[in-house]
Amino acid sequence: MSIAGVAAQEIRVPLKTGFLHNGRAMGNMRKTYWSSRSEFKNNFLNIDPITMAYSLNSSAQERLIPLGHASKSAPMNGHCFAENGPSQKSSLPPLLIPPSENLGPHEEDQVVCGFKKLTVNGVCASTPPLTPIKNSPSLFPCAPLCERGSRPLPPLPISEALSLDDTDCEVEFLTSSDTDFLLEDSTLSDFKYDVPGRRSFRGCGQINYAYFDTPAVSAADLSYVSDQNGGVPDPNPPPPQTHRRLRRSHSGPAGSFNKPAIRISNCCIHRASPNSDEDKPEVPPRVPIPPRPVKPDYRRWSAEVTSSTYSDEDRPPKVPPREPLSPSNSRTPSPKSLPSYLNGVMPPTQSFAPDPKYVSSKALQRQNSEGSASKVPCILPIIENGKKVSSTHYYLLPERPPYLDKYEKFFREAEETNGGAQIQPLPADCGISSATEKPDSKTKMDLGGHVKRKHLSYVVSP
């Protein structure tokens, strides 16, 4: 005996389906099969359309309705698939499939699809077990209590009072979209706290308004609107605002059938809308900006200057103009950057004194009393062979003493007297007189050298 036969006898379940060859349909199944006495009565567990709605479409559902209480014996392809005992509970005609060796591809697909869906719902097994397993759970969900290590499945909670519309609503809840729900022409039931629905705990929880498009309205807003309208409702209320459908119930457990709908009156919606004029706060009028205060008088106040004598027409004291700065950044500027003097004559040292226009009278009086204006320094340029050697170097001699004026006056008078007496009596001795005058003039030049230097001090070659 093969391993599959041993496993079949151990589990005591009839092997009703054969092996498929390369995915072929049920018509090409092998002829070898195992059969034994069965412990359970019915192959199919009261398959109702309500149960099959979760996994089958409408066409398959119509096809499988007669299978609810089908017979145990059904001839297929000339082989017996049923159990040995006759059916006692069957009241509907059995499912008959005409035997044919070559089924069309469309018919084969229908047969295989139907049996696959029955296998998903736990009606029959696809293949026999390969090895005997004693303590493992049953491979056949429909196995009886005598099966080792397995427990029967609880019956499905199907109520006869439940209408097909409620079931379709639940199926539609899992399959349809929000757009299809909004297009339905149905009235929404009002939310009830006192009457609990089936499998729901209404009244035990709170409503989460975050799932709704319409905002939550407090009791204060409701009382405010009723007082404002004077207790008179709006004669022409607009249609209620459609809110989006909830995916999960906010008051009951997940998957409750009755979805509550909350309706808020138009006045409440209008009150809570952000675009309404009543919701906007009243803005007080702007306070006029006061004019800028007059700028206080920050001028200097003293006993000598009063407000009457001080006027805006008075001008500040004069400031001496600045001399143009040299473009060079060196600390010792070149002579070319120095100011040029008129006629090439360098002014005396007193020219560096402050300008009398911007100097107080007391300073000028002090300079005049000291005699600084009459004193002139003696500057002698360096001359070689009748030419000035340098324009930057010179001899600075001390001030000319006053007694030299007497010597200069004496030598001038002596020249005039001696020169006129020698030239007149002896006109023929011009050569001798000229020879004698030359040493005399030379001595006069030596004696009056300091006098001549005074005149040379003012001549400076450019």
From Swiss-Prot:
Q: Where is the composition biased (Polar residues)?
A: 326-337, 362-372
Q: Where in the cell is it found?
A: Cytoplasm; Cell membrane; Nucleus
Its main subcellular localisation, reduced to a broad class, is: cytoplasm
- Which residues are recorded with the post-translational modification N-acetylserine? 2
Q: What induces it?
A: Levels are very low in quiescent cells. Up-regulated by mitogens.
According to the UniProt entry, which residues carry Phosphoserine? 251, 273, 302, 461
Q: Name one GO molecular function term.
A: SH3 domain binding
Please give a single GO biological process term from the UniProt record: cellular response to epidermal growth factor stimulus
Where does this protein have compositionally biased stretches of type Pro residues?
Answer: 284-293
> What keywords were assigned to this record?
Acetylation, Cell membrane, Cytoplasm, Membrane, Nucleus, Phosphoprotein, Tumor suppressor
Q: What membrane topology is annotated for this entry?
A: Peripheral membrane protein
Domain note? The EGFR-binding region prevents binding of a cyclin-like activator to the EGFR kinase domain, and thereby keeps EGFR in an inactive conformation. Also maintains EGFR in an inactive conformation by preventing formation of an asymmetric homodimer.
Q: Which family does it belong to?
A: Belongs to the MIG6 family.
**Assembly, per entry:** Interacts with ERBB2. Interacts with EGFR.
The record describes the protein's role as: Negative regulator of EGFR signaling in skin morphogenesis. Acts as a negative regulator for several EGFR family members, including ERBB2, ERBB3 and ERBB4. Inhibits EGFR catalytic activity by interfering with its dimerization. Inhibits autophosphorylation of EGFR, ERBB2 and ERBB4. Important for normal keratinocyte proliferation and differentiation. Plays a role in modulating the response to steroid hormones in the uterus. Required for normal response to progesterone in the uterus and for fertility. Mediates epithelial estrogen responses in the uterus by regulating ESR1 levels and activation.
**What is the official name of this protein in its record?**
ERBB receptor feedback inhibitor 1
Output the lineage of the source organism: Eukaryota, Metazoa, Chordata, Craniata, Vertebrata
Q: Which gene encodes it?
A: ERRFI1
